[in-house]
């Protein structure tokens, strides 16, 4: 197995483990504390990486005072969107499952294209095929079947509430991607990630102090806190750094295909680590979502 294939395999496996980790932390930590610790630790790691590997980018920004205010405004807005996105996403995971998070993550891809198509001509060209709409419809139907069957099995509305949180998160993420696309024309994506994660972590920390939730951390063992910090490192390295590497070295086509494999990896790891089980209808609906997204992304893949 060559190096590129090794990277692909490790990415799918590590991302498959990432959702159970987030689900586990969402159960044991209040959302504001969870996100503030994870984002501040992960953001700090990315800042260190930027200082070591991307000093030229930082010098370029400092050397152009005119764009500093421009970037600060957009990065701050991006941090706000990231804060909202992860608030709803973590709450969604708390009430659903790791697999549900990965399924809804797939739905974000075609939704992002639709929203981007409103503002960018190159994205608008991608939604002119009927296959896109057929695929999007299949994905939505599949996700609804998944949610309905899950909430019926639980016998309460918690799963349905979690699904609403996840839908809200992927909508915010789609709008957030528009800002990323605009800012990425000015600075490297890794620098964007470092800035966004740090700003989002600070915002979550302020909210945690304001709501007094931060004091709940006093009752948490040092082992769990270290685990949460490590989860922040893990999320940044797999969800951002490895993703950037694959997009840069292997292309968006390969990246999108790998994204479609993550729910399978998540289902297996979620079963082994969290004892999460799915019924036959949820399994079929998950496959429908994946097929729908493959159709919706088909033209995009050809163009990349």
Curated annotation (Swiss-Prot):
One short Pfam name that applies is EamA
Query: How is this protein situated with respect to the membrane?
Result: Multi-pass membrane protein
Cite the EamA domain residue spans from the record.
13-148, 171-298
Its localization reads: Cell membrane
Q: Name one GO cellular component term.
A: plasma membrane
Q: Which residue windows are transmembrane per the record?
A: 9-29, 67-87, 100-120, 131-151, 159-179, 189-209, 222-242, 252-272, 278-298
Q: Which InterPro entries match?
A: AA-Vitamin_Transporters, EamA_dom
Q: Which keywords does the record carry?
A: Cell membrane, Membrane, Repeat, Transmembrane, Transmembrane helix, Transport
Question: What protein family does this chain belong to?
Answer: Belongs to the EamA transporter family.
Q: What is this protein's name?
A: Uncharacterized transporter HI_0687
């Amino acid at each position: 197995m060559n190096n590129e294939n090794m990277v692909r395999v490790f990415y799918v496996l590590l991302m498959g483990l990432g959702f159970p980790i987030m689900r586990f932390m969402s159960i044991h930590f209040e959302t504001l504390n969870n996100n503030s610790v994870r984002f501040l630790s992960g953001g700090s790691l990315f800042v260190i990486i930027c200082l070591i590997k991307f000093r030229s980018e930082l010098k370029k920004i400092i050397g152009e005072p005119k764009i500093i205010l421009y970037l600060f405004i957009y990065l701050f807005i991006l941090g706000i969107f990231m804060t909202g996105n992860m608030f709803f996403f973590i709450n969604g995971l708390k009430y659903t499952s790791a697999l549900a998070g990965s399924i809804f993550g797939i739905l974000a891809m075609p939704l992002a294209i639709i929203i981007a198509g409103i503002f960018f001509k190159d994205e608008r060209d991608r939604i002119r095929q009927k296959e896109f709409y057929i695929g999007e419809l299949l994905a939505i139907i599949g996700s609804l079947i998944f949610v309905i069957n899950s909430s019926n099995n639980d016998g309460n509305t918690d799963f349905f509430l979690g699904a609403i949180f996840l839908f809200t998160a992927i909508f915010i993420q789609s709008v957030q991607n528009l800002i990323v696309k605009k800012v990425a024309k000015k600075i490297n994506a890794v620098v964007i990630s470092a800035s966004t994660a740090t700003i989002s972590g600070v915002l979550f920390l302020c909210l945690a102090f304001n709501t007094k939730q931060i004091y709940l951390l006093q009752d948490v063992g040092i082992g769990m806190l270290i685990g949460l910090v490590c989860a922040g490192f893990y999320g940044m390295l797999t969800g951002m750094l490895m993703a950037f590497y694959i997009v840069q070295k292997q292309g968006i086509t390969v990246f999108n295909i790998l994204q479609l494999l993550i729910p399978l990896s998540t289902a297996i790891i979620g079963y082994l680590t969290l004892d999460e089980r799915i019924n036959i209808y949820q399994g079929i609906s998950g496959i429908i979502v994946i097929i729908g997204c493959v159709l919706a992304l088909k033209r995009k893949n050809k163009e990349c």
